[in-house]
């Protein structure tokens, strides 16, 4: 029994700071591109100014850090899966947030994020039952549609950013293509940590090249202060609207189903299999992290699978590496100058990089759909209907123009339409199975199941 014990202690073993810090920093760098992409894209889509976007990025990094501490360090027996995981903005939430923001503004996004977080935290103990309604056929359809529908956002950035004077200028497209190329080259010729930060390298190299083309302005950095405490409700008192809350709650539940897969995978990697109890604490922490996100002007958080890849690479299994990463994120979030640096990334560079990122989201969804038994009653039809309905609303939103606005919001928001279609059709075709006592299927990210 001794060996089992040392394996278990690996997760909780404390390393000296000089070892923890570089590893923690690696985790921060691996999730950094994804973490700043969400506020940059949301800010761009909602036409916020550089100062507001700087604030969003700072709030995001700060809250990422707190959310990571809640999961990796945990709070007693209440919160946290206590595994080496890093929390960052969920990409699944990006397109619903843009829709809510365009229709109602930022404060309604935060209202919806807060309520959805509370709902998730409250539902944590019965999450095992809820998961039956979200099998791979549902989550895979939603995540595929999310990735596909976000490509239009990435394309707009690649062309110069919505509303930009030079929109569609060939040099914008060339810069986006160059950034994409850098990411592909790094992925082909490097291994390990360098490969894990390929997108970040693409963003940095792309921005350097753009600065020689006179496309980068550092005024936001010089104007930003060195220290600023993140202010709760900076953009105003949150507004609560039912349609926005329903949208956000569906997104949060599906992000939590994803997170469960990550927890189980990480548990397997660090040889500390997850108990039901630790999973409940993990889901509860996801909800509380999201509630904090809404209060601190940030976003819904979820455990990032990119970082799990690093765990496998670095062979260091202790959760204190992620605790260290969380502390680094909190410190970065208090330094607006650092957040302002990210706002200097020109739209085409961001577009080239997010094109790959969102493409990967779609592929993740497809990977989940690979697990679905296509010969079984209705599964093919469920996916076909969900993806078609989800993409249809995105491509031809005018179709819903005459509907009441709450219905319009949900149908126009592709991923939500896809998820609801898949949930309803799955209940229709497979209800016997869903309500039987069989084990629910939880998707475990591919690169992690080895």
Model-assigned labels for residue ranges:
Residues 17-19, 43-82, 247-319, 444:
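Membrane-embedded helical hairpins/re-entrant loop segments and their flanking transmembrane helices
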């Amino acid at each position: 029994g001794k060996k089992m014990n040392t394996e278990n202690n690996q997760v909780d073993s404390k390393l000296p700071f000089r070892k923890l810090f570089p590893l923690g920093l690696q985790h921060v760098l691996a999730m950094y591109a994804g973490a700043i992409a969400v506020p940059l894209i949301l800010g761009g889509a909602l036409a916020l100014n550089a100062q507001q976007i700087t604030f969003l990025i700072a709030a995001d990094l700060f809250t990422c850090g707190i959310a990571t501490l809640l999961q990796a360090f945990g709070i007693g027996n209440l919160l946290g899966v206590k595994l080496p995981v890093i929390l960052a903005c969920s990409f699944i939430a990006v397109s619903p947030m843009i829709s809510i923001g365009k229709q109602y503004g930022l404060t309604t996004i935060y209202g919806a994020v807060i309520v959805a977080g509370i709902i998730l935290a409250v539902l944590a103990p019965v999450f095992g039952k809820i998961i039956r309604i979200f099998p791979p056929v549902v989550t895979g359809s939603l995540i595929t549609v999310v990735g596909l529908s976000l490509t239009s956002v990435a394309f707009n950035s690649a062309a110069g950013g919505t509303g930009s004077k030079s929109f569609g200028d060939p040099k914008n497209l060339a810069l986006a293509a160059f950034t994409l190329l850098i990411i592909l080259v790094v992925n082909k010729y490097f291994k390990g940590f360098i490969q894990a930060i390929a997108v970040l390298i693409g963003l940095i190299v792309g921005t350097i090249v753009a600065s020689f083309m006179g496309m980068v302005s550092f005024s936001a950095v010089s104007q930003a202060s060195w220290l600023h405490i993140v202010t709760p409700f900076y953009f105003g008192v949150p507004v609560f609207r039912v349609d926005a809350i329903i949208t956000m709650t569906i997104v949060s539940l599906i992000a939590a189903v994803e997170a469960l897969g990550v927890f189980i995978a990480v548990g397997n990697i660090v040889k500390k299999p997850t108990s039901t109890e630790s999973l409940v604490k993990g889901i509860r922490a996801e909800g509380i992290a999201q509630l904090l996100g809404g209060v601190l002007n940030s976003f819904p958080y979820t455990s990032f699978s990119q970082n799990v890849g690093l765990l496998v690479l670095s062979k260091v299994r202790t959760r204190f590496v992620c605790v260290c990463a969380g502390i680094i994120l909190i410190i970065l979030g208090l330094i607006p100058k650092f957040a302002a640096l990210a706002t200097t990334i020109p739209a085409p560079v961001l577009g080239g990089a997010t094109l790959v990122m969102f493409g990967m989201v779609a592929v993740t969804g497809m990977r989940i759909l690979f697990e679905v038994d296509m010969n079984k009653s209705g599964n093919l039809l469920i996916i076909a209907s969900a993806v078609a309905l989800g993409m249809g609303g995105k491509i031809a939103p005018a179709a819903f123009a005459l509907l009441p606005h709450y219905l319009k919001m949900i149908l126009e928001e592709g991923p939500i339409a896809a998820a609801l279609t898949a949930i309803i059709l799955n209940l229709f075709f497979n209800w016997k199975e869903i309500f039987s006592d069989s084990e629910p299927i939880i998707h475990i990210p591919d690169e992690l199941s080895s």
